[in-house]
């Protein structure tokens, strides 16, 4: 510590406690004399009042620090609690969506006349269910066979016919395949060579 009360570049708190009253006394005398560069008005500031305010601020600062720390701790806890709550809500919503999906599926089945007739005919009997499904398979196979036959008939009717022979047995074009006009031009407007 040096002569000015500075320890390692800082001001000691005891020295500061001595300097503050001296500074305020100097400020008060400058204010009363009017010789100071800054005139503070007519209100006198007492050192005791300022020291009392400083003590109150010193009491408030630890409270604010504790509040800040508790907010920092609780923020992490609250965020994890919020995350857990959101995950639980998502699980509940997923379950609800599955329930709604199943309810929709059951509703569609109850509106389906084929399903209702299946349920009436089988009444939960495994043998009857097998027989009913086999009869439906036979119906489907019969319908597929009929569709295939009809497609074959339509395909045969729509198939292009083989073109008539335009060449003779020797491969020479037949003479009647072009019609010529007088003057040696064909119907299409081309001249024939003679």
Swiss-Prot record:
Pfam families associated with the record: DASH_Duo1
Region (Disordered): 151-194
Cellular component terms per the entry's GO annotation: cytoplasm; DASH complex; microtubule; mitotic spindle; spindle pole
The protein's assembly and partners: Component of the DASH complex consisting of ASK1, DAD1, DAD2, DAD3, DAD4, DAM1, DUO1, HSK3, SPC19 and SPC34, with a stoichiometry of one copy of each subunit per complex. Multiple DASH complexes oligomerize to form a ring that encircles spindle microtubules and organizes the rod-like NDC80 complexes of the outer kinetochore. DASH complex oligomerization strengthens microtubule attachments. On cytoplasmic microtubules, DASH complexes appear to form patches instead of rings. Within the complex, DAM1 and DUO1 may form the microtubule connections.
Family matches, as PANTHER family: DASH COMPLEX SUBUNIT DUO1 (PTHR28216:SF1)
Function: Component of the DASH complex that connects microtubules with kinetochores and couples microtubule depolymerisation to chromosome movement; it is involved in retrieving kinetochores to the spindle poles before their re-orientation on the spindle in early mitosis and allows microtubule depolymerization to pull chromosomes apart and resist detachment during anaphase.
Protein name (database record): DASH complex subunit DUO1
Gene: DUO1
């Amino acid at each position: 510590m040096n002569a000015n009360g500075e320890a390692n570049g800082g001001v000691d708190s005891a020295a500061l406690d001595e300097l503050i009253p001296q500074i305020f006394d100097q400020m008060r005398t400058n204010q009363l004399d009017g010789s100071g560069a800054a005139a503070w008005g007519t209100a006198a500031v007492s050192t005791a009042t300022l020291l009392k305010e400083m003590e109150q601020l010193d009491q408030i600062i630890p409270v604010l620090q504790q509040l800040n720390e508790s907010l920092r701790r609780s923020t992490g806890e609250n965020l994890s609690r919020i995350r857990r709550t959101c995950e639980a809500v998502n699980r509940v919503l997923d379950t609800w969506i599955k329930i709604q999906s199943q309810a929709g599926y059951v509703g569609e089945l109850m509106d389906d006349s084929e399903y209702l007739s299946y349920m009436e005919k089988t009444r939960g009997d495994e043998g009857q269910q097998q027989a009913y499904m086999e009869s439906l398979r036979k119906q489907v196979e019969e319908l597929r066979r009929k569709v295939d036959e009809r497609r074959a008939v339509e395909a045969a009717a729509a198939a292009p016919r083989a073109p008539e022979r335009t060449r003779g047995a020797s491969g020479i074009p037949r003479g009647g395949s072009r019609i010529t006009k007088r003057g040696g031009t064909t119907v299409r407007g081309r001249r024939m060579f003679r």
